[in-house]
């Protein structure tokens, strides 16, 4: 199971509500196949976890 702390991602985006919107939008993009993941997928991580990791690594921004 993937363990991820949301606090780092919240600091990158601004607040928890925007984080939810950005992560959900990014997860949906990956799920429907429109956009590839920007990081290597490990351990069958779900798209929401991948989206949060991309945000933490500054690969995805709020805009």
UniProtKB/Swiss-Prot annotation:
<comment type="similarity">
    <text>Belongs to the RNA polymerase subunit omega family.</text>
</comment>
<dbReference type="GO" id="GO:0000428">
    <property type="term" value="C:DNA-directed RNA polymerase complex"/>
</dbReference>
<comment type="subunit">
    <text>The RNAP catalytic core consists of 2 alpha, 1 beta, 1 beta' and 1 omega subunit. When a sigma factor is associated with the core the holoenzyme is formed, which can initiate transcription.</text>
</comment>
<dbReference type="InterPro" id="IPR006110">
    <property type="entry name" value="Pol_omega/Rpo6/RPB6"/>
</dbReference>
<dbReference type="GO" id="GO:0003677">
    <property type="term" value="F:DNA binding"/>
</dbReference>
<keyword id="KW-0804">Transcription</keyword>
<dbReference type="GO" id="GO:0003899">
    <property type="term" value="F:DNA-directed RNA polymerase activity"/>
</dbReference>
<keyword id="KW-0808">Transferase</keyword>
<keyword id="KW-0240">DNA-directed RNA polymerase</keyword>
<dbReference type="Pfam" id="PF01192">
    <property type="entry name" value="RNA_pol_Rpb6"/>
</dbReference>
<dbReference type="GO" id="GO:0006351">
    <property type="term" value="P:DNA-templated transcription"/>
</dbReference>
<protein>
    <recommendedName>
        <fullName>DNA-directed RNA polymerase subunit omega</fullName>
        <ecNumber>2.7.7.6</ecNumber>
    </recommendedName>
</protein>
<dbReference type="InterPro" id="IPR003716">
    <property type="entry name" value="DNA-dir_RNA_pol_omega"/>
</dbReference>
<comment type="function">
    <text>Promotes RNA polymerase assembly. Latches the N- and C-terminal regions of the beta' subunit thereby facilitating its interaction with the beta and alpha subunits.</text>
</comment>
<dbReference type="InterPro" id="IPR036161">
    <property type="entry name" value="RPB6/omega-like_sf"/>
</dbReference>
<keyword id="KW-0548">Nucleotidyltransferase</keyword>
């Amino acid at each position: 199971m993937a363990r991820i702390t949301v606090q780092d991602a919240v600091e990158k985006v601004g607040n928890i509500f925007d984080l939810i919107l950005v992560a959900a939008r990014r997860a949906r993009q990956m799920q429907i196949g429109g956009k590839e993941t920007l990081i290597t997928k490990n351990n069958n991580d779900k798209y929401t976890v991948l989206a949060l990791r991309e945000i933490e690594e500054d690969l995805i921004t709020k805009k």
